[in-house]
């Protein structure tokens, strides 16, 4: 069992190093990965702040700090939700759309570089697919929920 644990930890270290997860300037854009992930979700149409928080499994304090930082940079603006003023909807500003596109280009380039170093590319991609599926399944729960709530909206896209 210790060997399995050591292998998982080795894998975790390799991935976090490879993708720059611990860099203070993720992909050289002067913000950490957490803020970049929030920007990414908003850029892909996930504006409900509670749903973003649920998707990234962030506590409310960290979510607020990340969102406030993006707002202070002029990349994101928030508005009250039209159906519930206690909730907020985030959207990219014009500068935020440019930054989102820059991250998309840099992320694609990073993926291209990683794949370019792989001799057994198809095997690596199959392993990545398997891991993404297995790790995603581990987060699935079956429970009754408000169909208008952030968890339901996240599942229904």
Which residues does each PLM region occupy?
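Terminal interaction helix/tail motif
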Residues: 8, 101, 105-150
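Short amphipathic alpha-helical segments with heptad-repeat character
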Residues: 2-5, 9, 57, 97, ...
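N-terminal leader segment of winged-helix/HTH proteins
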Residues: 1-33, 142, 150-156
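Short, solvent-exposed beta-strand edge segments and adjacent coil->beta transition regions
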Residues: 55, 87, 137-139
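Charged, amphipathic alpha-helical coiled-coil/dimerization segments
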Residues: 68-125
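N-terminal helix-turn-helix DNA-binding core of bacterial DNA-binding proteins
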Residues: 21-62, 67, 73-75
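Short, solvent-exposed linear motifs at loop/edge-of-secondary-structure regions
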Residues: 52, 75, 147-155
């Amino acid at each position: 069992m210790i060997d399995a644990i050591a292998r998982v930890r080795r894998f975790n270290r390799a991935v976090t190093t490879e993708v720059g997860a611990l860099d203070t300037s993720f992909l050289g854009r002067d913000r950490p990965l957490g803020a970049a992930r929030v920007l990414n979700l908003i850029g892909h149409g996930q504006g409900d702040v509670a749903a973003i928080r649920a998707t990234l499994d962030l506590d409310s304090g960290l979510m607020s700090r990340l969102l406030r930082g993006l707002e202070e940079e002029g990349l994101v603006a928030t508005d009250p939700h039209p159906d519930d003023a206690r909730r907020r909807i985030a959207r990219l500003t014009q500068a935020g759309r440019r930054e989102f596109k820059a991250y998309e280009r840099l992320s694609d380039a990073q993926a291209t570089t990683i794949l370019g170093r792989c001799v057994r590319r198809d095997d690596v991609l199959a392993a990545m697919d398997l891991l993404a599926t297995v790790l995603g399944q581990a987060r699935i729960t079956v429970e009754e929920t408000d169909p208008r709530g952030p968890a339901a909206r996240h599942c229904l896209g």
